[in-house]
């Protein structure tokens, strides 16, 4: 806090420049022109800059270490204190001593700008508080000792040290003189809540800071009540509020109601809540709302990735995947028997979209390898796929496409056997549905899928690459644009096989190395 000094008024014949000030019936000061006080401050700052030819070097401020206080620990400690009962004693705020030597302050007599403000009935004050800004700007407050002592444990302590009838306190290096004036003025207010309602969140936080420094507990509580009720607009404002609350050191004030807006007493986000959200999204009957919420939840989970998430959340996702797979298999069986074809087609499209979304979630969390194993082993589903009309089945190939894209991007790294089984089981069904995917799915990106398929094939041994690409070549030559274009992968395989056959050279080189090592 700013440094405090006891001053004697009789020793300083200060020339105070009065500004237009109106005193309310409650004793609170206000300027007829709302910007009068700010203009005085600004004009003084500009004059000071012109007059100073070589500004004094300011001492370096010590770096503030970030507080390790957590929201939950503050809530827990605050609730414990409330359970113990109300506090009878008021703790005063200690004024930290100035560690580093400062340049000598300009004398009050030579200051170019001064403002005088009187609280309460004119001529009834019995104390003075002089606020001296860092650049010499001075505000002289005519106040009442009883009001200061009743509301501020800081002023009560300082005034108790003085013996004179008329006390004068000087606060030096005051960073925010305007807020000091407003906070002291709140001591004369009968209804602080009504006064604070006219302010914004940023200004109330500044008042809260000054109120804590002055030990003005009723003002601190009023500020907390205001912050608990008022909306916080934007993440930046929310961060300011929370950081200010966590820095509070005054005991006996309840910060829990404010902090409960952003934190609960639960140690971890409950698994049941996450499961419920996933279930609600997957079971939504309204397509537009379901699509929007899938996008929002995926974005939030992406932001939460690496943060404190329930360890068993992946189990929840895989449980939902299995439920969707069972539903798809049942729908395929019904559709193959000709039962309710239109209803089955719509529901298959919904379940396929759900599986694709769950795969997106797992890929973001780098936990999709198990899904690739499960999908590669869906042989019964792949056999039923051939029996269904294109209109009913092609949505399922979106899941296969998403897996190939993920492998091509390196989002999941299944084993060689899993990659080969995936291509063996689902590549031909994807070829058969490819033309419908291109024209029937707005979100389908053919170039991305083709790149993913090609990269997946090229991760296999050369013999498997040859087998799969020759099979693709026959389909492509017969189907044309209705088949994925894997020409890039075909060129890479060709060069590996015929232009740069590394295998023979490496085999010969390794044999020579082995024989040389044996001779030695």
Swiss-Prot record:
Q: Report the residue ranges that make up the BTB domain in this protein.
A: 127-196
Q: Which UniProt keywords apply?
A: Ubl conjugation pathway
Q: Does the keyword Ribonucleoprotein apply?
A: no
Tell me which InterPro entries the record gives: BTB/POZ_dom_prot
Name one process (GO BP) from the record: protein ubiquitination
- Annotated region Disordered: the residues are 43-68
Q: In which pathway does it act?
A: Protein modification; protein ubiquitination
Q: Which domain of life is it from?
A: Eukaryota
Which residue stretches, if any, does this entry annotate as coiled coil? none
Question: What this chain does, per the record?
Answer: May act as a substrate-specific adapter of an E3 ubiquitin-protein ligase complex (CUL3-RBX1-BTB) which mediates the ubiquitination and subsequent proteasomal degradation of target proteins.
Fill in the domain comment: The BTB/POZ domain mediates the interaction with some component of ubiquitin ligase complexes.
The protein depicted here goes by the name BTB/POZ domain-containing protein At3g50780
**Naturally occurring in which organism (per UniProt):** Arabidopsis thaliana
């Amino acid at each position: 806090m700013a440094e405090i000094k006891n001053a004697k008024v009789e020793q300083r014949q200060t020339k105070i420049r009065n500004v237009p000030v109106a005193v309310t019936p409650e004793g609170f000061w206000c300027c007829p022109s709302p910007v009068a006080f700010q203009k005085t401050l600004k004009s003084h700052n500009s004059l000071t800059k012109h007059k100073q030819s070589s500004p004094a070097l300011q001492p370096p401020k010590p770096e503030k270490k970030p507080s390790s206080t957590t929201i939950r620990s503050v809530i827990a400690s605050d609730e414990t204190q409330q359970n113990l009962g109300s506090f009878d004693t008021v703790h005063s705020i200690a004024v930290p001593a100035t560690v580093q030597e400062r340049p000598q302050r300009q004398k009050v007599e030579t200051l170019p700008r001064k403002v005088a403000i009187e609280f309460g009935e004119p001529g009834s004050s019995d104390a003075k508080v002089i606020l001296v800004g860092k650049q010499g700007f001075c505000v002289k407050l005519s106040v009442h000792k009883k009001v200061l002592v009743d509301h501020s444990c800081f002023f009560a302590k300082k005034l108790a040290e003085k013996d004179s009838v008329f006390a004068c306190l000087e606060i030096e290096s005051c960073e925010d003189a305007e807020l000091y004036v407003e906070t002291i003025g709140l001591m004369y207010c009968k209804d602080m809540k009504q006064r604070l309602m006219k302010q914004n969140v940023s200004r109330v936080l500044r008042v809260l800071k000054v109120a804590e420094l002055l030990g003005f507990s009723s003002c601190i509580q009023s500020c907390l009540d205001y912050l608990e009720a008022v909306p916080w607009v934007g993440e930046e404002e929310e961060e300011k509020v929370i950081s200010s609350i966590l820095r509070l050191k005054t005991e006996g004030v309840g910060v829990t109601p404010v902090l409960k807006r952003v934190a609960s007493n639960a140690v971890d986000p409950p698994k049941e809540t996450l499961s419920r959200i996933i279930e609600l999204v997957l079971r939504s009957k309204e397509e537009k709302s379901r699509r929007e919420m899938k996008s929002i939840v995926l974005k939030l989970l992406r932001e939460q990735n690496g943060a404190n998430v329930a360890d068993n959340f992946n189990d929840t996702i895989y449980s939902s995947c299995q439920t969707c797979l069972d539903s798809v298999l049942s729908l395929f069986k019904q559709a193959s028997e000709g039962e309710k074809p239109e209803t089955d087609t719509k529901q298959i499209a919904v379940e396929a979209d759900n599986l694709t979304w769950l795969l997106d979630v797992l890929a973001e969390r780098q936990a999709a390898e198990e899904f690739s194993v499960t999908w590669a082993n869906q042989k019964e589903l792949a056999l039923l796929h051939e029996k269904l009309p294109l209109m009913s089945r092609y949505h399922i190939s979106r899941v296969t496409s998403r897996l190939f894209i993920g492998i091509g991007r390196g989002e999941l790294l299944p084993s060689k056997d899993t990659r080969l089984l995936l291509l063996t089981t689902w590549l031909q069904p994807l070829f058969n549905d490819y033309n419908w995917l291109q024209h029937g799915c707005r979100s389908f990106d053919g170039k991305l899928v083709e790149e993913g398929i090609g990269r997946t094939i090229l991760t296999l041994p050369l013999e498997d690459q040859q087998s799969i690409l020759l099979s693709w070549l026959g389909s492509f030559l017969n189907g044309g644009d209705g088949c994925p274009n894997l020409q890039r992968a075909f060129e890479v395989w060709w060069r590996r096989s015929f232009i740069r056959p590394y295998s023979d050279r490496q085999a010969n080189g390794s044999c020579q190395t082995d024989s040389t090592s044996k001779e030695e």
